[in-house]
UniProtKB/Swiss-Prot annotation:
GO terms for biological process: 'de novo' UMP biosynthetic process; pyrimidine nucleobase biosynthetic process; UMP biosynthetic process. Gene3D superfamilies: 3.40.50.2020. Catalyzes the transfer of a ribosyl phosphate group from 5-phosphoribose 1-diphosphate to orotate, leading to the formation of orotidine monophosphate (OMP). It comes from Methanosarcina acetivorans (strain ATCC 35395 / DSM 2834 / JCM 12185 / C2A). Orotate binds at T133, R161. Belongs to the purine/pyrimidine phosphoribosyltransferase family. PyrE subfamily. This is Orotate phosphoribosyltransferase. Its EC number is 2.4.2.10. HAMAP family: PyrE. GO terms for molecular function: magnesium ion binding; orotate phosphoribosyltransferase activity. It comes from the Archaea. 5-phospho-alpha-D-ribose 1-diphosphate binds at R103, K104, K107, E129, D130, V131, T132, T133, S134, G135, G136, S137. Its cofactor is Mg(2+). Pathway: Pyrimidine metabolism; UMP biosynthesis via de novo pathway; UMP from orotate: step 1/2.
Length: 187
């Protein structure tokens, strides 16, 4: 999606390098034996919670994601609990767009809603995700948002592990826009 990316290849590369340095500096990239939420085994782990709780790194993520959001023609920034919430909140603050939080399941008390924030059928949203592997969590969130009549065409992820999320989201008529890929990060 050329319209949602910064203007030049050099600018994109500069932004990637800035984010990669920040992710490594805050300890978000770890090596060892890990089991991912998808159930897959991995020799590395991207702990974006480290990044989203570090003000400097979160600000870099928010600024870079906001540049892309501004070109997407959306009116709401959404995040899936838990990992997407601080990211979407920061991007909401950076862009001035309203925030929507999508719960993974209906809560059994209070409003019993899967959503925190206003959601109308005419809304156009971008979803924020911390790390994408298979894209399963965000696909589920897109489905429940679309059931309300709202439109989700884009998902911005901080790191795409390049393990099928892009293709799965394309099948769901949504475009994955990674700030960096695992290949970028592990070079």
């Amino acid at each position: 999606m050329s319209q949602s990316k910064p203007d030049t290849g050099n600018e994109i590369e500069t932004q990637k390098q800035e984010l990669i340095a920040a992710l490594k500096a805050c300890g978000a990239v770890r090596y060892g034996d890990f089991t991912l939420s998808s159930g897959k085994k991995s020799k590395y782990y991207i702990d974006i919670k480290k990044a989203s709780t570090d003000p400097k790194t979160l600000k870099i993520i928010a600024r870079q994601a906001a540049l892309r959001v501004k070109e997407m023609g959306v009116g709401t920034v959404a995040g899936v609990e838990l990992g997407g919430v601080p990211l979407a909140t920061a991007v909401s603050l950076e862009t001035g767009l309203p925030l929507l939080i999508v719960r993974k399941s209906v809560k059994e008390y209070g409003t019993k809603s899967r959503f925190v924030g206003d959601l109308r059928p005419e809304d156009r949203l971008v979803m924020l995700e911390d790390v994408t592997t298979s894209g399963g969590s965000v696909r589920d969130a897109i489905k429940v948002v679309r059931e309300t009549g709202a439109c989700v065409k884009y998902v911005i992820t901080v790191v795409d592990r390049e393990e099928g999320a892009k293709e799965k989201l394309k099948e769901a008529d949504a475009e994955l826009v990674p700030l960096v890929t695992a290949s970028d990060l592990l070079k």
